[in-house]
């Protein structure tokens, strides 16, 4: 059973990346994170949402991105879900510096950033049916 949970859904406009980042940060604030911890979460969410918009929906603004977040004791689990084009090769996509959109001058560091700032990263994707990125982080909660 979770201590708390939330979900939000928004259209795949790049302007909504900031909204997603702040909404998740506000939800996580109940764990009384440090500035560094909250920035880690915001950065990882930003990368995942940006991936959904740029890669999943190929910058189309007619898709939906869903975020589900759940707090269990001292850990937050955040899922970023899209119904975009999916990822052909997850292992390749997770390699540092790999990008499927070199035409957009993308750095190919999104998954690496998520792995660096979070405690766990899971990616599930099916070509033509979208992608689900799950990131987790534990906090030093003082009772």
From Swiss-Prot:
Pfam families: HATPase_c_2 (PF13581). Gene3D superfamilies: Histidine kinase-like ATPase, C-terminal domain. Its EC number is 2.7.11.1. One of its GO terms (molecular function) is protein serine/threonine kinase activity. It catalyses: L-seryl-[protein] + ATP = O-phospho-L-seryl-[protein] + ADP + H(+); L-threonyl-[protein] + ATP = O-phospho-L-threonyl-[protein] + ADP + H(+). Keywords: ATP-binding, Kinase, Nucleotide-binding, Serine/threonine-protein kinase, Sporulation, Transferase. GO terms for biological process: asexual sporulation; negative regulation of sporulation resulting in formation of a cellular spore; sporulation resulting in formation of a cellular spore. InterPro entries: Anti-sigma-factor_SerPK, Anti-sigma_F, HATPase_C_sf. Binds to sigma F and blocks its ability to form an RNA polymerase holoenzyme (E-sigma F). Phosphorylates SpoIIAA on a serine residue. This phosphorylation may enable SpoIIAA to act as an anti-anti-sigma factor that counteracts SpoIIAB and thus releases sigma F from inhibition. Belongs to the anti-sigma-factor family. PANTHER family: ANTI-SIGMA-F FACTOR RSBW, ANTI-SIGMA-F FACTOR RSBW-RELATED. This is Anti-sigma F factor. It comes from Clostridium beijerinckii (strain ATCC 51743 / NCIMB 8052). The lineage of its organism: Bacteria, Bacillati, Bacillota, Clostridia, Eubacteriales.
